[in-house]
Amino acid sequence: MKKNSLIVFFATILFSLVSNSIYSQDNLLYNMSHVPQINNTNPAKNPSCKAFVGFPALSSLYFDINNTGFVYKDIFKQMPTELDSFMIDLDKIENALESKNYLTFDYKYSLINFGFRIKQEWYFTFGISTNINEQFMFPRDYVSLRRGNYSETGIPLNLGIKENLSIYHEFAAGLSKKFYNGLTLGVKIKYLSGLANLQSNKLNLSWATSTADTAIYDWNFDTDFDIRSSVPVGWGFTRDSSNFIDGAEITEFDPDSSAQVEKFLNENRNSFLFTNNRGFGIDIGFDYKIDNQFSVSGSIIDLGFIKWKDNAKTLTQSGQFVVSGIDMAKYYGDYNSVVNAGTTTWA
């Protein structure tokens, strides 16, 4: 009994340490032992079958969307005059949002994967997959903006966002061992080949509306950007006549020429699979069967890194600017002449 209590205690500590960094998890797969993909959630959990094989078009496709802000019931409300119609409830959405909200998207396509049991206690798995992971942060003030840009509290609107997008290939080999006392330990080692990345370390934007007598309703914007990217094609920034960046373009080939695009893809087909953006990852986990009805398990997955090198660029910007309105006299001439021209005198 002491041994069981000790395992439960350490499992609780493990979940406490990692819970703050978890935004989504394959909850539906976790205890589905008849599905080979159970190994993706915990390398110590293995399918009940002796062996499995997956090929392109016959393998698994997984995607997952989560958000920390609102749920479905917060989005719609029934129309008061029409019982069979619904409308978007912006007030309820705003109340459900936090100051910072996260939207995550995960996609995994298995190109090939297989696994087999060795004797009774060992299980080996191997897989190659393409992964897309995105995490987008947005503030509540984007919904609050529907009431206007003026703030009675004097606090500027926070319109800063955060984006982290990674596309990469994963080559993973896993091994687990079942011990005689009901404990199973597993580990999965991953080689990562990055394809593209977009990361905003800082993407801060605030909007304040002035109420001073000398600058009534002036719009004051503060910006602070730090954006980093890596893509599989050569590209660069374009600049205007004042040498300010006004856009970006592909420099390695002409994207409007189908012949050049096809030539580039044929010449670089292998480099898309094995890039210079190399990294490593690891999954570790345990599963302890207490009895026929209860078990305790835990895992840490996707712990690793990718060092981005291919066509890596950084864009930084920090500044302030003020919008004081539009001087209509520049477009319509003198205001008094316009008024006088439209005035009629009655005798």
Regions found by a protein language model. Name each.
Residues L6-I7, H34, Y288:
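Short hydrophobic/aromatic segments of transmembrane alpha-helices and their interfaces
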Residues M1-L28:
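Bacterial Sec-dependent N-terminal signal peptides
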Residues L17, N46, S59, W235-G236, ...:
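A generic alpha-helix propensity feature with a strong bias for hydrophobic helices
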Residues N27-L29, M137, Y142-A347:
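Outer-membrane beta-barrel porins/channels
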